Amino acid sequence: MKIAKNVVVSIAYQVRTEDGVLVDEAPVNQPLEYLQGHNNLVIGLENALEGKAVGDKFEVRVKPEEAYGEYNENMVQRVPKDVFQGVDELVVGMRFIADTDIGPLPVVITEVAENDVVVDGNHMLAGQELLFSVEVVATREATLEEIAHGHIHQEGGCCGGHHHDSDEEGHGCGCGSHHHHEHEHHAHDGCCGNGGCKH
């Protein structure tokens, strides 16, 4: 079976940054399973998989615009500390989910000053070209329910135990996808800008 829209695909992969740093992988014995054609992977990888079959191995370089986008300076904001309600200590690297006009947005603290902090809403891989090494492990026809929902169904939830909540970008899992699993804190009203952040 060739990979095409509405085919469920299992892939083993490694993904590295331009400087060779391994940022994610799924081995053959624990492959990533997804539904093709529903934006469950970064678009550059999904396009490269189109027409492939079980046993195919390949490498593909994915430009930022077909991965996690270019780095956007407008996604970096300085906000007052007092909007982070219920957080005892703010430190660089803390992650929050900000409720914005465009929906939930993951942000990370990149600087902490006396009265304010800098938060960055860019994806950690924004602006980077990614190298994927991929092997197609299995394919099957999707169920009507999977097609209707736009993602696979399996015991334990999406991708082996994760729930169906997702960020604004998609429903997949793993670095090759857009799924977001950081739920430590929640920010409200525009990237922690107006209302506040809380657990």
From Swiss-Prot:
GO annotations of cellular component type: cytoplasm
Residues where Ni(2+) binds: C173, C191, C192, C197
Signal peptide start-end: none
UniProt cross-references to InterPro entries, sorted A to Z: PPIase_dom_sf, PPIase_FKBP_dom, SlpA/SlyD-like_ins_sf
EC number: 5.2.1.8
Domain of life the protein comes from: Bacteria
Keywords: Chaperone, Cytoplasm, Isomerase, Metal-binding, Nickel, Rotamase
Compartments (UniProt record): Cytoplasm
Region (PPIase second part): 129-151
Catalytic activity annotation: [protein]-peptidylproline (omega=180) = [protein]-peptidylproline (omega=0)
Region entry IF-chaperone, spans: 76-120
Pfam family membership, one: FKBP_C
Principal location listed in the UniProt entry: cytoplasm
GO biological process: one example: protein refolding
Chain positions covered by the region annotation PPIase first part: 1-69
Residue intervals of the PPIase FKBP-type domain: 6-95
PANTHER family named in the record: FKBP-TYPE PEPTIDYL-PROLYL CIS-TRANS ISOMERASE SLYD (PTHR47861:SF3)
Notes concerning its domains: The N-terminal region consists of two globular folded domains that contain prolyl isomerase and chaperone activities.
Record's protein name: FKBP-type peptidyl-prolyl cis-trans isomerase SlyD
Originating species: Pasteurella multocida (strain Pm70)
